[in-house]
Amino acid sequence: MFPGGGKFNPRMMKQMQKMMKDFGMDAEDLKAVKVTIELEDQLLVFEKPKVQVMDMLGNKTYSITGKAKKVAKEEEKIEDVEVKVEVTEEDIEMVSSQCGVSKEEAKKALEEANGDLAEAILKLGN
């Protein structure tokens, strides 16, 4: 790939970097500690990677070099928790008087609406 029998020549590297700049390309090394790529079913984790960003006419390309570890993706578990809402006597009276229903009906509507006065009134109004 490199002229000169494949041996690395630092002067040649400087010439290549100058040519890249002339063509509107710029490369910069980033001091990354860890890179994680999230796939559908797993994670790829690069510890101590070499990361280089190349800017070519405004488009940035990131190059990651290093050894990747495949890590199982943990499912985020959200548990359904039943919350019992305390319904105040004041709220029950308000819903009861607004809708012309008994206090028991007003309390039930408030509990079903998780204490939301407006929702309980709308529910009883229909």
Swiss-Prot record:
Q: What is this protein called?
A: Nascent polypeptide-associated complex protein
Family in the record: Belongs to the NAC-alpha family.
From what superkingdom does this record's organism come?
Archaea
Organism of provenance: Methanococcus maripaludis (strain C7 / ATCC BAA-1331)
Q: Which Gene3D superfamilies does the protein's record reference?
A: DNA helicase RuvA subunit, C-terminal domain (1.10.8.10), Nascent polypeptide-associated complex domain (2.20.70.30)
Query: PROSITE patterns attached here?
Result: NAC_AB
NAC-A/B domain ranges (all copies): 10-77
Coiled-coil spans are none
